[in-house]
């Protein structure tokens, strides 16, 4: 049986979240769903709409089997740290073998290409060149990936859910699968 992890804020839990859980179960068959969910504080540094216990209850009623808390330092951080913290919690649980996440474009190929690029020396060199021009980091990051891989792969960095998906892919250990 697969045990799937989902990293989320569920602020609040809605039908799209329930659909993700249902689609994950449909794609993988018999599986358990473990969620790493932010606590009282969410990624933008805001207080969640409802307390973490209420949101965890909504997730359980919406199809999750277990909800773990993503500690505040990771929950309120950048996409990279949010992803690393969430994947870290799921890996530490010792049972999750697949990560399920949403993407805006639906095509995972550019996400994988961007994730691989962000770990390369060529990327770091291109990024430094753009940063030296005094541009904001996010713009430099996207420009460096566009220079190396083209517009399609770089565009995913401008879409919040795809950007987070790229960071999930970067944080995944090799033994863990991904389902977008």
Locations of regions flagged by a protein language model:
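Acidic, Ser/Thr-rich peripheral helices and adjacent loops at domain boundaries
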Residues: 54-57, 122
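Active-site cores that bind ATP or allylic diphosphates and position pyrophosphate for catalysis
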Residues: 69-180
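Divalent metal-coordination and catalytic microenvironments
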Residues: 14, 59, 169
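N-terminal catalytic cores of NTP/NDP-binding nucleotidyl/phosphoryl-transfer enzymes
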Residues: 1-55
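Non-catalytic positions within long, well-ordered alpha-helices that form the structural scaffold/packing
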Residues: 25-26, 60, 87, 91-92
């Amino acid at each position: 049986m697969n045990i799937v992890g989902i990293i989320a804020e569920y602020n609040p839990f809605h039908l799209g979240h329930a659909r993700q859980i249902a689609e994950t179960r449909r794609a993988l068959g018999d599986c358990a769903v473990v969620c790493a969910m932010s606590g009282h504080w969410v990624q933008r540094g805001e207080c969640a709409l409802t307390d973490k216990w209420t949101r965890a209850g909504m997730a359980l009623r919406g199809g999750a089997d277990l909800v773990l808390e993503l500690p505040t330092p990771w929950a309120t951080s950048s996409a990279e740290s949010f992803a690393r913290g969430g994947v870290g919690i799921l890996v530490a649980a010792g049972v999750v073998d697949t990560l399920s996440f949403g993407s805006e474009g639906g095509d995972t190929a550019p996400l994988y290409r961007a994730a691989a690029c962000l770990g390369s020396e060529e990327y770091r060199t291109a990024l430094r060149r753009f940063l030296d021009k005094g541009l904001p980091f996010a713009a430099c990051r996207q420009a460096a990936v566009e220079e190396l891989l083209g517009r399609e792969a770089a565009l995913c960095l401008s879409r919040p859910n795809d950007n987070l998906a790229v960071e999930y892919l970067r944080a995944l250990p090799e033994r863990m699968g991904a389902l977008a």
